[in-house]
Regions:
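Residues at the starts of beta-strands that form the adenosine-phosphate
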Residues: 117-118, 175, 196
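Substrate-recognition element of Asp-dependent hydrolases with the DxDx(T/V) motif
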Residues: 84-88, 94-100, 105-136, 144-148, ...
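Structural motif
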Residues: 192-193
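Conserved small/polar residues in nucleotide/adenosyl-binding loops
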Residues: 202-203
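N-terminal helical cap/lid subdomain that shapes the substrate entry/recognition surface
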Residues: 2-103
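Conserved Lys-Pro-Asp/Glu-containing loop-to-beta segment of HAD-superfamily phosphomonoesterases
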Residues: 154-187
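Short acidic capping loops at alpha-helix termini that bridge into adjacent secondary structure
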Residues: 83, 140-144, 172-176
Length: 203
C-alpha cells in the first residue's frame, strides 16, 4: 500500500514548457535581444536538456549548467555572450512568475492529501521552485519540499533520497513511489533508492 508519493515538479505537476517560454521571452525583451522564435526556443530546449542530463550523471556542476547552456545557445544563435550570467539570474526569477498545472495535477494532489503523504522532490533552482510552489498553492498542499540545491546533491543520486528519508522517516520500499517525467532523473533516482517508480502516468 502506497503511503508516500514523491512528486517531481517540472513536467509532472507543473508545465515547465509554458514557464520556460514565458521566462525566455521576458528575458529576450529585457536584454534587448530581439525575438526568441519557436525554432530558437526548441533549439534551446535541446541544449538545456543535455546540460541537465550531464548534471544528473555528475559530469557538470550546477553553475556549469546554469551558465553553460545559455552560453552555448547564444553562441549558436549569433547572440552576444557577455550577459549570460545576468540573463540566467533574471531567467530563474521569471520562471517563478507563472505556474501552469499539467493536466489535473492540482486536483490530484488535493484528492490524495487525506490518504497519503506527498512531497516535492526537484532539481530546479531554489529561487524558481519556491516561487512556483507558492504561486501554485502547492506549498500549502504538500507535506514538504526537497530542492536538490538545498539538499546538496541532485536526483538521481541515492544520497538525495537518503536525505529525504532522514527528514520524513523510514518506509518500506513498496510504500513509496516517485512520480516524474524524467527517465534519467526521476525514474533512475527511484531505482537507485529502491522505491516504486511511475513515469507521470498518474497525472
Amino acid at each position: 500500500m502506497i503511503k508516500v508519493i514523491l512528486w517531481d515538479i517540472d513536467g509532472t505537476l507543473l508545465n515547465f514548457k509554458m514557464s520556460e517560454r514565458y521566462a525566455i521571452n521576458y528575458c529576450f525583451s529585457k536584454f534587448h535581444m530581439g525575438t526568441c522564435t519557436d525554432e530558437m526556443l526548441q533549439r534551446y530546449s535541446v541544449i538545456n536538456r543535455g546540460y541537465w542530463e550531464r548534471l544528473e550523471t555528475g559530469e557538470l556542476t550546477r553553475e556549469q549548467v546554469m551558465l553553460g547552456r545559455f552560453h552555448e545557445f547564444f553562441e549558436s544563435e549569433g547572440l552576444p555572450t557577455d550577459q549570460v550570467k545576468a540573463f540566467n539570474d533574471e531567467y530563474q526569477i521569471r520562471l517563478g512568475d507563472k505556474a501552469f498545472f499539467c493536466d489535473r495535477g492540482d486536483e490530484l494532489v488535493k484528492q490524495l492529501k487525506s490518504t497519503v503523504k506527498q512531497y516535492a522532490v526537484t532539481n530546479g533552482t531554489t529561487v524558481a521552485q519556491e516561487r512556483k510552489l507558492r504561486l501554485s498553492g502547492l506549498d500549502q498542499l504538500l507535506d514538504g519540499v526537497f530542492i536538490s540545491e538545498q539538499v546538496g546533491v541532485d536526483k538521481p543520486q541515492k544520497a538525495f533520497f537518503d536525505a529525504v528519508w532522514n527528514e520524513i522517516g523510514s518506509y518500506a520500499p513498496d510504500e513509496v513511489v516517485i512520480v516524474g517525467d524524467s527517465l534519467t532523473s526521476d525514474i533512475r533516482g527511484g531505482k537507485n533508492a529502491g522505491i516504486l517508480t511511475d513515469r507521470k502516468s498518474v497525472v
